[in-house]
Curated annotation (Swiss-Prot):
Domain S5 DRBM: 20-83
GO BP term, pick one: translation
Highest taxon in the source lineage: Bacteria
UniProt keyword list: Ribonucleoprotein, Ribosomal protein, RNA-binding, rRNA-binding
SUPFAM superfamilies membership: dsRNA-binding domain-like (SSF54768), Ribosomal protein S5 domain 2-like (SSF54211)
Record remark on domains: The N-terminal domain interacts with the head of the 30S subunit; the C-terminal domain interacts with the body and contacts protein S4. The interaction surface between S4 and S5 is involved in control of translational fidelity.
Listed name of the protein: Small ribosomal subunit protein uS5
Family membership noted in the UniProt record: Belongs to the universal ribosomal protein uS5 family.
Region of interest called Disordered, as start-end residue ranges on this chain: 162-192
Organism encoding this protein: Methylorubrum extorquens (strain PA1)
Disulfide-bond pairs as recorded: none
Pfam families for the chain: Ribosomal_S5, Ribosomal_S5_C
């Protein structure tokens, strides 16, 4: 009976792992100086997501590459964050993020735009499940800083529901204001 339970637990863990997509962002050879010389190892940066709005990143170090990747993947799964997506495909509004000397600007994009982002940011958006976004990185191009800056920006994003709750309004009132301020609607009003 204990074996049955143990087997079921393992199956659940494998099922949970299969829902995640992981991307290796960066691998680096590192050296530890010891009495007899240098001891080489590897450091891996991995981004993990379920392509439904949850994403995390992790850093792992080990003597062998596969072990470093495994450690980084486990760390990424422990640090997942949830990001609210508009229509399940893009951001609700433009956001900025920063970590160290790495700065990123993320902009919501119309349907069909695709992921316009470079390197480490693209991996974050693909594992997150975002389909339309325009991103620009400024400053440092260090993958660690860019991934952390991207996560900082994603954490700064507010959904209309959270903004409405903070202001004591209904979501429909916020979205009505958004439609009133839309430049496409004002041009039609000027023609009429």
């Amino acid at each position: 009976m204990a074996r049955e339970r143990e087997g079921r637990r393992r199956d659940d863990r494998e099922e949970r792992d299969s829902e995640f997509v992981d991307k290796l962002v960066h691998i680096n050879r590192v050296a530890k100086v010891v009495k007899g010389g240098r001891r080489f190892g590897f450091a891996a940066l991995v981004v993990v997501g379920d392509q439904k709005g949850r994403v995390g990143f992790g850093h792992g170090k080990a003597r062998e590459v596969p072990e470093a990747i495994r450690k980084a993947t486990e760390a990424a799964k422990r640090g997942l964050i949830r990001v609210s997506l508009r229509e399940g495909r893009t951001l609700h509004h433009d956001v900025n993020g920063r970590h160290g000397a790495g700065k990123v600007i993320l902009r919501a994009a119309p349907q069909g735009t695709g992921i316009i982002a470079g390197g480490p940011m693209r991996a974050v958006f693909e594992t997150l499940g975002m389909q339309d976004v325009v991103a620009k990185s400024l400053g440092s191009s260090n993958p660690y800083n860019l991934v952390r800056a991207t996560f900082d920006a994603l954490k700064n994003e507010d959904s209309p529901r959270s903004v409405a709750a903070r202001r004591g309004l209904k979501v429909s009132a916020l979205q009505a204001r958004r439609r009133d301020a839309d430049p496409a609607d004002t041009s039609e009003a000027a023609v009429a």
